[in-house]
């Protein structure tokens, strides 16, 4: 049968000139494909409708998957076995009892919690000969930070579950049982303590573990990590090598693996049943983006290896009265308790002491309760391989495509995407900083994702207008592949910086949370290589003259099976091309158009869904972890608004190669979404009952001080208090650094209020030697456990337990020492400026001595000392009034160690 004969079906024949001058017949009408083929073509052909459908499905998939993965209710199952149900019920009851009252170190309720825990521990370990209990008190004097010395009297509760193999180093479980004065401490750290009791009960009722497990129920973590520091000096501490610290820097939700000391210990977190983790938070903590610390810091600095497991949100009720039982889900407790049991069970019964990776920082994440981790070295090796392979593979392919396959990349191709990124970034900066931020500055505290989604819509519209506008003015070929290659290059540059940072990873310059760039680059680069390979293996087209011409141009990307809707039809570049010339290339062109009309779907599925999920989930976790800190400082506010812009830009990046194919309905939807978002941003209140304004309080020397961000309306809130209106007292607001203010007013004191007292007197003053002076004071602050002293030029301090005597300064060793009378010394010739004092006795007097060196030009060789003592649980009418009368969208936290303080000044 000749080429001009009909094979099957009815087909219209068209003669076509061949290079040899002969004529062949080409069919222009073929048999209609079946419905399945037509459906596949309609779905996966490069049509605007198909692309828009894919984009919408990707957005739905991304948000739904992330929401599910981060959901407490969907991912954490309550226990089903009888024993675990009993453990959870018992721990929940413990939590209710622990959090009955605020129980800071300086409160009487703290003693009640101590006694309750002492009773529960004794009851749990009764009749267990392999378990020991140490509930003795301890005293320490140490250098807690630069020029600061702290004295602490502690009453930690220590339990040792002895293992069957004494040669194995011990494993520590730690949590603190104190709260802040303004909070019931359910999450911080009642759930940690309740979980410790649950794990202790689990060990006491099961087979004796192979490895010794030690529990530290420690006190006074909130204002100096004192309980953990005191335990470091305990004899049991010497046998410990591993630890798990349980903490709460939020108020409920899921307990996340904040950070780990090294890969060798972090990798074992895959043994827990509900892992929830990301090293993004580890990077944030290590780079000081979170302005709080946990006992993890003490244990790591003491040489232990371990994990920090904690609740992290929401910070606007963290340290407030809203951190209470009624705001907590029992699943949160079970999440922490079950993971603690699993991790303890594995560590205590496994030989992990020869593990590799103990000197390697860890990179980790969890997905749907699956845990993945690797070391910095391993990821760096992968990154370097990818960095080298990308130019090695893509360079030759790009050269072949351009040189031999005649891929014409014009100026519009090269510069349209970079130009669009620059312009859109500027638009985003103006919209966010000069628009949203000025209209509703503190909105990120309650609706951060409204800002993100609205910004994303505006930026996506901007990209659509710019890219289509450039393409209209200067039509370009295969812009999709060009864009994919350019985005791959952007990720390649970013990966180089990430790899460099990881190679020098350190505290303060941590990069362990930037693993997402490896994933994003791998996906984008693979798609770009796929596109280049497709170009490389195409056949050349012969013109009637026999000369070669390019097989493909940008206009061949359209779907060509006749099912295009009106939005999918694109004008051809050369409208005056003759009908005969069209038919000359129809068969070859049709093959290429079908090939390149479907490759987009593979590229889209390879790049967009996973990239979108990685970017969205990472951005959501960062925003969810830091958005409340906008109430803490201007620096935090600047960072949050920067993250909103970066989040929006990066979320759009994966779909940029396809953005000009969005159909008009998607564009209209984006416009509507942006308009609704802008309207809401302009009208909604930044604070509400679920996302309250957080203010901090202290009454100092009879004057109430309220601290918060400038611009949140503190003076208006205070001006509505009955005592302020009735007394006519003025409210004075002073600006503080970093965007904060201190608003103060004379506190209301009814006749029956308990007024604390503070007295400081000099009890000994001598000139020890010609160049050094000595003096001592006595501080009497009934019902106060905590005081702070500020001074200058002090070289050594003494905490007296007995007779006050002046020891020869040269005889005092540097650092900490203790004499035969039980007096504690700390000497630092570089200077001590602050002393923090913490005592257990309620009416015990502080006796302190000081060695100082006066300046040569001082007229008087006296040492000025400023003393401030704090009270936590006395009646505070001004604070009670604020709790009672402020709106339900305001919460209150402590500013200092107590809610009331008195100051005194003395010269020795």
Curated annotation (Swiss-Prot):
Question: Which EC class heads this enzyme's classification?
Answer: hydrolase
Primary residence:
membrane
Which ranges sit in the Cytoplasmic compartment?
1-48, 403-411, 471-480, 536-602, 660-664
Catalytic-site annotation from UniProt: 221 (proton acceptor)
The cofactor(s) it depends on are: Zn(2+)
Q: Please give the superkingdom of this protein's source.
A: Eukaryota
Which residues of this UniProt protein bind Zn(2+) 2?
A: 188, 222, 319
Q: Write down the InterPro entries for this protein, in alphabetical order.
A: Fxna-like_M28_dom, M28_fam, Peptidase_M28, PFF1_C, PFF1_TM
What is a biological process (GO) this protein takes part in?
Answer: proteolysis
Q: Topology with regard to the membrane?
A: Multi-pass membrane protein
Protease as a keyword of this entry, yes or no, is yes
Query: What does the Swiss-Prot or TrEMBL cofactor note state?
Result: Binds 2 Zn(2+) ions per subunit.
Q: Provide the site residues for: Transition state stabilizer.
A: 318
Where found, per UniProt?
Vacuole membrane
Molecular function terms from GO: metal ion binding; metalloexopeptidase activity
List the biased-composition ranges (Acidic residues). 562-579
Q: Where are the transmembrane segments?
A: 49-69, 382-402, 412-432, 450-470, 481-501, 515-535, 603-623, 639-659, 665-685
Q: Which GO terms describe its cellular component?
A: vacuolar membrane
EC number(s) per entry: 3.4.-.-
Report any Pfam family annotated for this entry.
PFF1_C
Amino acids binding Zn(2+) 1: 176, 188, 247
Q: What does the record list as coiled-coil region(s)?
A: none
The region called Disordered is annotated at 1-25, 543-584
Family to which the UniProt record says this protein belongs: Belongs to the peptidase M28 family.
The UniProt function text for this chain reads: May be involved in vacuolar sorting and osmoregulation.
Name the UniProt record assigns to this protein: Vacuolar membrane protease
């Amino acid at each position: 049968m000749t080429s001009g004969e009909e094979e099957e079906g009815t087909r219209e024949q068209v003669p076509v000139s061949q290079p040899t001058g002969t004529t062949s017949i080409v069919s222009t009408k073929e048999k209609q494909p079946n419905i399945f083929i037509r459906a596949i073509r309609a779905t996966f052909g490069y049509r605007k409708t198909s692309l828009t459908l894919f984009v919408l499905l990707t957005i739905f998939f991304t948000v739904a998957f992330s929401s599910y993965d981060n959901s407490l209710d969907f991912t954490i199952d309550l226990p089903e076995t009888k024993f675990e149900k009993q453990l959870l019920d018992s721990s929940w009851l413990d939590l209710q009892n622990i959090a009955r009252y605020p129980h800071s170190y300086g409160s009487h309720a703290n003693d009640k919690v101590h006694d309750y825990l002492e009773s529960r521990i004794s009851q749990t370990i009764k009749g267990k000969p392999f378990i020991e209990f140490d509930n003795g008190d301890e005293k320490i004097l140490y250098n807690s930070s630069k020029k600061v010395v702290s004295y602490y009297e502690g009453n930690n509760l220590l339990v040792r579950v002895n293992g069957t193999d004494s040669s194995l180093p011990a494993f520590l479980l730690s949590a603190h049982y104190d709260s802040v004065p303004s909070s019931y401490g359910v999450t911080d750290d009642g759930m940690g303590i309740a979980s410790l009791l649950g794990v202790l009960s689990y060990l006491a009722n099961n087979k004796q573990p192979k490895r010794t497990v030690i529990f530290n129920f420690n006190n006074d973590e909130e204002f100096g990590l004192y309980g953990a520091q005191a335990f470091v000096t305990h004899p049991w501490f010497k046998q410990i090598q591993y630890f798990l610290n349980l903490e709460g820097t939020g108020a409920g939700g899921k307990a996340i693996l904040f950070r780990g000391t090294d890969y060798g210990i972090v990798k074992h977190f895959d043994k827990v049943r509900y892992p929830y983790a990301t090293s993004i938070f580890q990077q944030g903590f290590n780079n000081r983006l979170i302005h709080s610390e946990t006992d993890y810091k003490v244990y790591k600095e003491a040489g232990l290896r371990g994990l920090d497991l904690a609740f992290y949100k929401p910070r606007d009720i963290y340290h407030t009265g809203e951190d209470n039982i009624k705001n907590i889900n029992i699943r949160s407790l079970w999440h922490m308790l079950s993971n603690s049991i699993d991790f303890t069970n594995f560590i205590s019964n496994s030989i992990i002491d020869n593990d590799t990776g103990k000197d390697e920082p860890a990179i980790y994440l969890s997905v749907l309760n699956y845990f993945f981790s690797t070391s910095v070295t391993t990821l760096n090796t992968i990154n370097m391989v990818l960095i080298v392979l990308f130019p090695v593979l893509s360079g030759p392919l790009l050269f072949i495509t351009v040189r031999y396959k005649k891929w014409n990349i014009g100026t519009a191709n090269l510069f349209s995407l970079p130009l669009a990124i620059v312009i859109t970034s500027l638009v985003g900066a103006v919209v966010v900083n000069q628009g949203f931020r000025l209209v509703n500055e503190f909105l990120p505290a309650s609706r951060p994702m409204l800002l993100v989604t609205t910004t994303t819509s505006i930026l996506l519209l901007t990209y659509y207008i710019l890219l289509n506008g450039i393409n209209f003015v200067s039509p370009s070929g295969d812009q999709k592949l060009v864009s994919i290659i350019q985005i791959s290059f952007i990720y390649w540059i970013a990966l180089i910086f990430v790899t460099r940072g990881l190679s020098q990873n350190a505290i303060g310059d941590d990069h362990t949370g930037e693993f997402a760039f490896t994933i994003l680059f791998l996906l984008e680069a693979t798609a770009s290589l796929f596109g280049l390979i497709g170009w490389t293996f195409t056949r050349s087209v012969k013109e009637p003259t026999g000369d070669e011409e390019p097989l493909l141009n940008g206009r061949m990307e359209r779907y060509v099976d006749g099912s295009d809707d009106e939005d999918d039809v694109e004008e051809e570049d050369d409208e005056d091309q003759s009908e005969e010339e069209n038919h000359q290339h129809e068969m070859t062109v049709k093959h290429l158009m079908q090939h390149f009309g479907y490759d987009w779907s593979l590229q889209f599925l390879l790049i967009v869904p996973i990239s979108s999920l990685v970017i969205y989930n990472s951005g959501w976790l960062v925003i969810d972890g830091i958005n409340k800190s906008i109430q803490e400082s201007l620096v935090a506010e600047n960072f949050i608004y920067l993250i909103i812009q970066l989040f929006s830009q990066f979320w759009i990046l994966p779909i940029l190669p396809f953005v000009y194919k969005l159909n008009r309905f998607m564009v209209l939807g984006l416009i509507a979404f942006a308009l609704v978002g802008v309207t809401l941003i302009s009208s909604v209140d930044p604070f509400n009952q679920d996302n309250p304004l957080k203010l901090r309080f202290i009454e100092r020397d009879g004057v109430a001080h309220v601290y918060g961000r400038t611009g949140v309306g503190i003076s208006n809130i205070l001006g509505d208090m009955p005592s302020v209106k009735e007394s006519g007292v003025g409210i004075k607001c002073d600006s503080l650094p970093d965007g904060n203010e201190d608003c103060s007013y004379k506190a209301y004191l009814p006749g029956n209020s308990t007024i604390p007292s503070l007295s400081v007197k000099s009890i000994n003053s001598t000139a020890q030697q010609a160049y050094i002076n000595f003096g001592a004071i006595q501080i009497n602050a009934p019902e106060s456990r905590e005081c702070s002293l500020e001074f200058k030029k002090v070289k050594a301090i003494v905490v007296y337990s007995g007779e006050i005597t002046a020891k020869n300064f040269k005889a005092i060793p540097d650092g900490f020492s203790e004499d035969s009378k039980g007096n504690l010394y700390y000497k630092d010739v570089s200077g001590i400026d602050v002393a923090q004092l913490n005592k257990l006795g309620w009416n015990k007097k502080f006796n302190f001595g000081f060695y100082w060196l006066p300046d040569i030009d001082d007229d008087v060789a006296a040492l000025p000392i400023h003393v401030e003592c704090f009270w936590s649980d006395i009646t505070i009418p001004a604070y009670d009034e604020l709790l009672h009368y402020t709106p339900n969208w305001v919460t209150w936290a402590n500013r200092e160690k107590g809610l009331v303080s008195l100051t005194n000044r003395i010269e020795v």
